[in-house]
Amino acid sequence: MSAFTPASEVLLRHSDDFEQSRILFAGDLQDDLPARFECAASRAYTQQFHHWQALSRQMGDNVRFSLVAQASDVADCDTLIYYWPKNKPEAQFQLMNILSLMSVGSDVFVVGENRSGVRSAEPMLADYAPLNKVDSARRCGLYHGRLEKQPQFSLESWWAEYNIDGLTIKTLPGVFSRDGLDVGSQLLLSTLTPHTKGKVLDVGCGAGVLSAALASHSPKVRLTLCDVSAPAVEASRATLAANGLEGEVFASNVFSEVKGRFDMIISNPPFHDGMQTSLDAAQTLIRGAVRHLNSGGELRIVANAFLPYPKILDETFGFHEVIAQTGRFKVYRTVMTRQAKK
């Protein structure tokens, strides 16, 4: 994190107004403004492990990563600055959670890019903190209101589920493919053969659908699942439990918290981080896989056909093959051999 996002640049136009504020930063925290903003006190709360990693280097215990905010995250804060994400249900989940903890009378600021749908904040918060638009610049909107009524928030009411091939998939707002199995994952699933054995790592596990489907027809696999998203980690745990499956699930920025080597790594890697296109996670996945695959171990990923993954696969492993494809997606497979660049 270094350069400020357009949303942060809009906030900086009003920096003098915040000098006496005790601020909680939350939402899509794509830069380190929470650590550098001049104010009376600054805290940050995030559901994204990689955002917590970056901010904790400067903010220490004043930034926290978890599924839901707690009273301690809001302690003494009189102002919320919320960065609007591209996912509206995710925004609603987070705002209802945070505002249920903040004191009536607190200042509420919502900032985000117009293309992210930040305008939806006005009707969403109309009953709790009626918003007015106070600035428009850098293709972003900045809204302000005061908390008039705390919303009710119960985590249980936000869970959803769907069924696929006899499996129950548990989901939460902010989890990839929350409303059903996406086409890319479906294509990757079609390539997983029954009676797979060994240790399997599912990177960017989402709701845990890939691992659950694999384990349902390959009961001897030993599953490890990870994701940067706190809702995804909790959803994957719930999916495994709902189907009587076992596996280790934890938060990790690709391989940052992963220990050991595996016989197979599977992934439907993201190529967006918030509103921005980013291949960083997928490149880290491919290049880092050589340090986490056993000899003869396999990396199998699905991706949009236009993304430049074949080049990275060949540079890292020496070869790749396409084992399934549609007009939009391809499933790539490569194997850990002596020619892989460790």
UniProtKB/Swiss-Prot annotation:
Gene Ontology MF terms: 16S rRNA (guanine(1207)-N(2))-methyltransferase activity; nucleic acid binding
Single GO cellular component term: cytoplasm
Chief localization: cytoplasm
Protein's recorded name: Ribosomal RNA small subunit methyltransferase C
Pfam annotation, one family: MTS_N
Signal peptide start-end: none
Record localization: Cytoplasm
Catalysed reaction, written as an equation: guanosine(1207) in 16S rRNA + S-adenosyl-L-methionine = N(2)-methylguanosine(1207) in 16S rRNA + S-adenosyl-L-homocysteine + H(+)
Gene3D superfamilies with a match to the protein in the record: Vaccinia Virus protein VP39
Enzyme class: transferase
HAMAP family named among the record's database cross-references: 16SrRNA_methyltr_C (MF_01862)
CDD domains listed in its UniProt record: AdoMet_MTases
NCBIfam families reported for this sequence: PRK09489.1
Enzyme Commission number(s) from the entry: 2.1.1.172
Purpose: Specifically methylates the guanine in position 1207 of 16S rRNA in the 30S particle.
Self-association and partners: Monomer.
Keywords noted in UniProt: Cytoplasm, Methyltransferase, rRNA processing, S-adenosyl-L-methionine, Transferase
Family note: Belongs to the methyltransferase superfamily. RsmC family.
